[in-house]
Amino acid sequence: MVLSQRQREELNKAIADYLRSNGYESALEAFQKEAEMPGEIEKKYTGLLEKKWTSVIRLQKKVMDLEAKLAEAEKEFQSGGPNKKERSPSEWIPRPPARYSLSGHRSPITRVLFHPVYSVMVSASEDATIKIWDYETGDFERTLKGHTDAVQDVSFDQQGKLLASCSADMTIKLWDFQTFENIKTMHGHDHNVSSVHFMPNGDFLISASRDKTIKMWELATGYCVKTFTGHREWVRTVRVNQDGSLLASCSNDQTVRVWVVANKECKAELREHEHVVECIAWAPESCNGHVSEVMGAEKKGRSGPFLLSGSRDKTIKMWDISTGVCIMTLVGHDNWVRGVVWHPGGKYIISASDDKTIRVWDYKNKRCQKTLEAHQHFCTSIDFHRSAPYVITGSVDQTVKVWECR
């Protein structure tokens, strides 16, 4: 590409200004001599080279985003896929490219979670902090500091007034989400606390740890009121069902256990995974009809509860908890499955994996409908907003990404 005489002169002046402002005096002298330039450079050239440089990078990013969107649209057009107007919100799925890629953490992201009410989300990291972001604008809001080691999991109560976090520092912290103050710290586990989840009534909290136990905590006092024992290895994740009567846990012992909260009885031990089970998710009621359909006419009357589990054996399994039977196994990821969520519309499952992708599964037909190249490194966590069309992911690449669904 050939520059005009005027463009060449402007470029020379911008380069001269850059050399002068960065103190490269001898280079500037030589450059001005070679380029036969006057000694004085007008003010309008101050910082011009940097401005041009950053605007080129910005434009390049926009071009790449538009190219990705165009490629996506062409693919959909060729496959005769419906557009957003024709597709109902219950069928919207995350589409590339990511709407935002948010940086700020200094270590891998361990967990991402939407706030149940406000348009914010939180991310937990091995850098011992929790960060709060606005997922609609991509703005960073604040950092919560208090843990002294990796933050492993976070959970909101149903109103979103309280946030609980747990850490490798062996503590659980309770944060007031209005003032962002740490209002309680709970001690009792003997090792890394890997998971935390509020009970639906908001009065109690459940935690799981590398010490092989699950504990129930009373928020008013901060005391441990129940301990569930039975897992033979590190308990990775614990999640409570919608009415708070059951809790599910998964472990390095390759099992998923379901417990009756009232009497601590282990109702089911699910043992078909062949490696560490990393993540679990209870089916919301919106999914029960779809799952019953998949199970066939003779079992249609059954209303669950149903549970998903994701494992280092690279599979996702769906379980009928009333019978302890594995309904299906979804195969497709090329590495550990680290996160799994139900689509609020009930038809899909979305998963995140160490193969750096997120996958959308049409479980009725037992097939992977879409694969998104999500991150530069392992994808460690995923969440789907209950009512807004957004998915968020976190990664070892230290970024949080926001994906729009359509």
Curated annotation (Swiss-Prot):
- Record keyword Cell membrane present: no
Give the UniProt keywords, A-Z: Cell cycle, Cell division, Coiled coil, Cytoplasm, Cytoskeleton, Microtubule, Mitosis, Repeat, Transport, WD repeat
Which stretches does the entry tag as region Disordered? 74-99
Which InterPro entries does the protein's record reference? Dynein_regulator_LIS1, G-protein_beta_WD-40_rep, LIS1_N, LisH, PAC1-like_LisH-like_dom, WD40/YVTN_repeat-like_dom_sf, WD40_repeat_CS, WD40_repeat_dom_sf
Cellular component terms (Gene Ontology): axon cytoplasm; centrosome; cytoplasmic microtubule; kinetochore; microtubule associated complex; neuron projection; neuronal cell body; nuclear envelope
Q: Where do the WD repeat units fall? A: 104-145, 146-185, 188-227, 230-269, 272-329, 332-371, 374-406
Q: Which GO terms describe its molecular function?
A: dynein complex binding; microtubule plus-end binding
Subcellular location(s): the record lists: Cytoplasm, Cytoskeleton; Cytoplasm, Cytoskeleton, Microtubule organizing center, Centrosome
> What biological-process GO terms show up in the record?
brain morphogenesis; cell division; establishment of mitotic spindle orientation; germ cell development; microtubule organizing center organization; microtubule sliding; nuclear migration; retrograde axonal transport
SUPFAM superfamilies per record: Lissencephaly-1 protein (Lis-1, PAF-AH alpha) N-terminal domain, WD40 repeat-like
| Compositional bias per record (Basic and acidic residues), positions renumbered to this chain | 74-89
UniProt domain LisH: residue ranges:
7-39
Coiled coil feature spans: 54-81
Q: What is its main location?
A: cytoplasm
Matching entries from Pfam families are given as: LisH_PAC1 (PF24951), WD40 (PF00400)
Its domain description in UniProt is:
Dimerization mediated by the LisH domain may be required to activate dynein.
Q: What does the protein in this record do?
A: Positively regulates the activity of the minus-end directed microtubule motor protein dynein. May enhance dynein-mediated microtubule sliding by targeting dynein to the microtubule plus end. Required for several dynein- and microtubule-dependent processes.
Q: What is this protein called?
A: Lissencephaly-1 homolog
What is the native source organism of this protein? Branchiostoma floridae (Florida lancelet)
Its lineage opens with: Eukaryota, Metazoa, Chordata, Cephalochordata, Leptocardii
